Design a protein with these regions (language model features):
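Non-membrane alpha-helical structural segments and their capping/turn regions in soluble enzymes
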Residues: 86, 90, 114, 118, ...
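Short secondary-structure boundary segments
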Residues: 77, 136, 218
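Active-site acidic/histidine proton-transfer and metal-coordination neighborhood
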Residues: 12-13, 20-21, 38, 59-62, ...
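Residue-level recognition of beta-strand->loop/alpha-helix junctions
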Residues: 52, 76-77, 107, 159
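Histidine-acidic metal/acid-base catalytic patches
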Residues: 2-45, 54-71, 170, 175-188, ...
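Glycine-rich, proline-tolerant flexible connector loops at the mouths of alpha/beta enzymes
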Residues: 74-91
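A short, flexible beta-alpha/helix-coil linker loop
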Residues: 80, 162, 221-224
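Short, well-ordered beta-strand segments
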Residues: 47-49
Length: 251
């Protein structure tokens, strides 16, 4: 039996969200006397990291998200450059709205100077979002703290596993931000966290008060050798992850 790409993705997403439910469908017919229990409310807001479409233009990206029934995107600068004019930003939002997609954040944006931090915060303000996914140099964190207070934004540091020295895992982000403004936290990339030898489920539980965004992926190994693979075929325990997301009220 053949399935369309849309059917494949929608069935896969539905299956993933059902993993954390408290009841399992039973083969027996429901009792005709007892009223049916209300359906569980899905608390999650499923979005897409703009970087996923690094090799695709904005039109293709938005058409794909619409087909997949995904309505949120983290805006990457190759789709909306940091030096965009206000008119270009309005046109970007209009195009997103035509496909029922909303930009909820910008990034990841790498920041190696105070000037680059200033530019990123100004960009986010003009775009109209309150969350920046960023990667600042360690020594710039006090300046990020200052800007978060000034703009009243949340700032989620994207962790990168063993591939680069800065922010390899959730614990590293926590240790560098725990004494800063509580609006500074992390984008928990569960694949990279595992690739650095960590347990993303345990890390979500420990650090959930500072988890402002998540990148969901599966990987083949809990080491630098791990590479991306279809969800369910790798090493991440997704039923446990979904249960933990519910437990800590991550939405």
């Amino acid at each position: 039996m053949k399935h369309s790409r849309r059917t494949f993705f929608k069935q896969g997403l539905a299956g993933a969200l059902l993993l954390g439910t408290s009841t399992i469908a039973r083969a027996a017919l429901p009792d005709p006397v007892k009223p049916k229990a209300p359906k569980a409310v899905n608390p999650f807001h499923l979005g897409m990291a703009g970087y996923t479409f690094v090799n695709f233009d904005l039109d293709t990206t938005l058409k794909t998200l619409e087909r997949l029934d995904i309505h949120y995107i983290c805006i990457k600068d190759f789709h909306l450059p940091l030096n965009s004019t206000d008119e270009q930003i309005r046109a970007f939002h209009d195009k997103c709205a035509a496909h029922k997609v909303t930009g909820y954040a910008v990034g990841p944006i790498y920041m190696k100077s105070e000037e680059e931090i200033d530019r990123a915060f100004d960009y986010a303000k003009r775009v109209g979002v309150k969350l920046i996914v960023g990667v600042p140099n360690y020594e710039l964190l006090p300046y990020v703290d200052k800007k978060v207070k000034e703009y009243d934004f949340h700032y989620a540091i994207h962790l990168h596993g063993p591939d680069i020295k800065t922010y390899p895992d959730a614990t590293d982000v926590w240790e560098h931000t725990k004494d800063l403004d509580p609006r500074i936290g992390m984008c928990l990339d569960v694949g990279h966290d595992l690739r650095n030898g960590c347990d993303p489920v345990a890390d979500l539980k420990k650090y959930h008060t500072r988890v402002f965004d998540m990148h969901i992926k599966d990987v083949t190994d809990s080491s630098k050798a791990g590479v991306g693979i279809e969800i369910g075929r790798g090493k991440i325990d997704f039923p446990a992850l979904i249960r933990m997301m519910r437990e800590v009220n991550y939405t």
